[in-house]
Every structure is written in C-alpha cells, then in structure tokens.
Amino acid sequence: MVYKKALNLSVTFLLIFILTGCASTRKNVEQILFGGGNNNEAEIVSNAIPGSSQDFTVNVGDRVFFATNSTSLDDDAKAILERQASWLELYPEISIIVEGHADERGTREYNIALSAKRADIAVSYLESLGIAGDRVETVPYGKERPVAACSSEACWSQNRRAVSVVITEE
Amino acid sequence: MINQMNRLILLFSLLLFFSTVSQAALEIDVSEGNLRPMPIAITTVIDKQNEQLGLGLDITKVIASDLAGSGLFYPINPKAFLEEVNSVDRNPNFNSWRVVNAEALFTAELISDNERFRINYKLWDTFSEKSLEANYLVFSKNKWRNVAHMIADTIYTRLTGEKGYFDTQIAFIAESGPKTNRMKRLAIMDQDGQNPILLTSGKDLVLTPRFSPNGKELVYLSYRNGQPQVYIYDIQSKQTYVVGTFPGMTFAPRFSPDGTKIIMSLQEGVGSNLFEMNLSNFDRKRLTNTSDINTAPSYSPDSRNIVFESDKSGTQQLYVMDAGGDNVRRISFGTGSYSTPVWSPRGDYIAFTKISKGRFMIGVMFADGSGERIITDGFHNEGPTWAPNGRVLMFFRESPGEDGGAMIYSVDITGYNERKIETPGYASDPSWSALMN
C-alpha cells in the first residue's frame, strides 16, 4: 500500500509537470504513463484540453467493468480507478458523478440495487486513494442505459460498468 | 349448464393441482385442447332511439371481447343466430338458442334521455330456461366502456362463481426511442389496451408504477431530481410528490393493501434494506437490516406478511417475513434465482420472475413456497402483476437484440390463454388495478 501510494504520488507529480507543459511533451508522457504507444491514440490525446472531460475520458479512462452479478473490482478496474484518482488529485476543483450500470440479464429493481452497489464500490476505492467523498456522487441506472444494444455477452460485458463522469460547468 | 361451468372450474382446479404435484412437466400440463370455452350468445344491444350512434354495437363488441379474452367463453358468431331479439322484456325462444349451442344468452337494450343512457340487460341459462341476471346501469356516454366491462364482469361472475377483472386499468411504462437511450413515460390504459394515456413527458426516466388500492394514485420511481426516488402520482390532479426524504436512493415501492402505507427499499452503503412508510404521518419503520440487496417487497392481502427478494444466500431468492420484519423464512428452493415476488389478491399464490440457465420465466408458488409452477419461459419474461380476482397475470416480455423491446402479455394462472396486450409502442412494468367501479 505504501509503495502504491508513493507510486501514485510520483505519477501525480509527473502529470503535473507534463500537463502544465505543452501538448507535444504530453504525448510522450502518455506513452510513458499508460503505454499508449499507438499513434492514433496519441493523436486523440493531443486534441483534449487538459482537465477537460474529454481529457479524462480519453487519457485516463472513465469506466470500469464487472463480471455478471458481481460488484468486485478486478485488477484492470483498480488500475483505471487509480488513474482516475491521480487525475482528480491534479484537478482538485473538479467533481465527478459515478454512474452504476447493469446488463439486461437481470430484473429491474435488483439491477438498480446492483448498479448502486457497483457505483458505491468504485467510489469507496477512489476514497481509499485519497479522493474526498464530497467530490463524488453516484447515480444508479440499473439496466436502463446500456451502451451496447446487442443481446450477447459481447454487449453485456460492456454494459456492466461504473462510469465516472466529470461534472462540467454550465 | 351452470354445472358444466362448475365442471370447467373444477377442471381448472384439478389441472392446477396436478401440475403442482408433477413439477417436471409444468408447461405442457395445461393445453388448450383440455379446455372447452363455454359457448355464449351475446346479442347486439338494442338501441332503437340512437341506432346511428352505434353505441349499442360498441358495447356489445367490448362485452364479447372481454369474455372471449378470458379464455373461458366462446362468443358464438351472430350470423349463426336464428332468433332476432327485439326486446329484453320478452322471453327468448330458448330452443332456437340451444340449437346454435348457446349455453348462455345475453340480451340488452339502451334507452337514452338527453346525455343519460340506461342499459337494461338479462343473462339467461338456455337449458334451464331461467334468468341468471336481470339488471340495469345508468351512465353518461363517456363511461360506455366502463359499463361494458362492468356487464362483462357480471356475466363472468354469474357463470364462473369468480369475481371479474374487466373493469380495471393497467399502469405501465410506455417506451420509445433507441435501446441505448430509451424514453420511458408513465402511462395507464384499460385492461384490454384501450384508452392509453401518457402521464409524464418523458423528460425524466420513470420506472415501476404500482396502483394504489383505490386506483387513484400510482407509486413509482423517478429520476426527476437526478437521484432515483419514490414518488406518488395523483391521477386526477396530475400532482406528483416525493415519498419522504431519505439519505439515499429509494426504490421498489408498493402500497399496503389498505393504501395507508408504502413499503420500499432504501439503498444504504453497499446494501439495500426494506422500509415501511406511513403516508399519514410519514413515520418510517425499518424492516430489514443487512448488507445485502433486499428489495421487491409485496404485502399479503391481509397485511400480516411481506414477501421480498434478497441475495443474502448468494443469489436472489424469495423470503417471507411478518409485517413487522420478524420471522424471516426463505420460500424459494428451486434451481436458479427468484425475484419480483407479488402476492395474489386471493392470498393463495405468490407470482415471481425466475432466472435459470439464462432464461427468464414467470411462475407461481403457494405462499409457503410449495407447488412451484412455471407459466411462461423464454429469453426474457419479467415482472408479473395480478388481476384483482387472482386468476390472471400480466407481465412483460422483452425481445432480444438491438431493436428489441418489451411488450405486455396476459395469461391465465394455469398457463393457458396467453395474449399480447396491444399498446402504441413498447411497454413494460405493468401494474393491474383493483376493480374501478
């Protein structure tokens, strides 16, 4: 844990250093931080304004996924949330809403409760990484807002998710 | 003839009984061939004064449609009738009705006085040649459908010994738009799908409406303040109000049988627990206190017990507890998970959604958990609701795929006589009202 915190801190400093710099150096840092060696990704990266919701979605990763009926965070999910926490530390004025979602293979009310649990677990993990609870709200959507509409595991796995949405100024 | 109907009811009961004991072959025990709907002659309502209005014919059609829709009656094609009925006062020629196999005969006439209508009607047993019912109703024109349903209810009751369910409404969610951003609106319609009325604009996501026992209010879930919360909608005044202020999300609401309380779930931390809210003084009472998902509560009709679902065992299962929250006992033990329990208005059965091997089924079991019987099985069936007589269920069935969506179906609790309710678009979350009049 201590090691992880230290790592997060160093990542944070690195990010501060880079993100306050010019866009061309950010591209390199993307590659260092997230292994984004792909040129296409780097292209998108360079267009996002640092601290914007696009920056968050594209460069950090706004969502984590869950197994069927599960509310546990796997290693991939934890890694994404750690990146989200680092980004949120960079922009302390920004708040987020974590939307919980479930796939269509459950009954409506149970899925609402399940998606609430997913959102809460993501938030608890962000809080454990030092993000203040008052910066994070949750909204459970159950199975009401799928991102993928097909009726097979390829879509259901995308729909079992917790999505962090940056609250933008009106 | 009445004995014959009683035999039909007995047959239903026997089928229920046998399908209950032989659980293995649930779906095929009841087949249409086993049941012979009673042939009934429904003569066109005589309307000498206002024939051009067609009101008599309209009422006749609704009565025939209700009775045929129940699966227990077979309205004989009027073209086969040998006798033309010109008056309800004269006794019919029973022989001419027996010849066309009519076991029961309905005759009626309309009399109007300005905007007031009066319908005089009679129901005859063509074999005993006795009158089973002779009555009248006075109504204003806009209530003609209710009147037709009320008469159909009377016929159903006289010939089956059961209460009717035709003069009822269904609250539901009207759906439109793409699957990834579906618009959902609160709506009501008559039990036969007629008179659909949209109650909300679609701006806010709304789900799971349930009728109050008097049919005047709906309790439902709305995202109008961002967070999902339980609201009440007053159908007459169109007013909406939130049911109490809770620290977290409230959902899965239902009225108590006397309409004075709401039971629902409150999400707290990682669990969801059941609360009862008194609507007169807003007192709230905690009924469960665990870190599991406890939801979908439904009172027994005598208000003494509550059935609900909980995943405390690892999967969703059904539990019954005393109305105060004590004496929790699990009642579902089959393969798979069980959810959305609803107690029958008769108190005998609990209807539920069952998920097993990737299939979604509607089933019923006795309140002690015995006698489980699956009524329909497929890709996705969910959310049963009871007709007020406890004989018929509605539920929604979702079709798979990108263009898939939900439609509402009704089915007899024997599994027989499944029918799709025609709605303007996709429709889900049905809730059956009590009898309206």
What are these regions (language model features)?
Chain A
Residues D76-R83, E109, K117, I121, ...:
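Extracytoplasmic/secreted proteins, especially bacterial periplasmic and envelope-associated proteins
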Residues P92-H101, A116-V147, R160-E170:
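A non-catalytic structural micro-motif
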Residues I18-G21:
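C-terminal motif of bacterial Sec signal peptides marking the signal peptidase cleavage site
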Residues A23-S95, T168-E170:
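Periplasmic peptidoglycan-binding/tethering modules of Gram-negative envelope proteins
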Residues M1-V11:
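Bacterial N-terminal signal peptides that target proteins for export
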Residues A154-Q158:
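A generic structural micro-feature
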Residues A148-S152:
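Short beta-alpha junctions and helix-cap segments that line functional grooves
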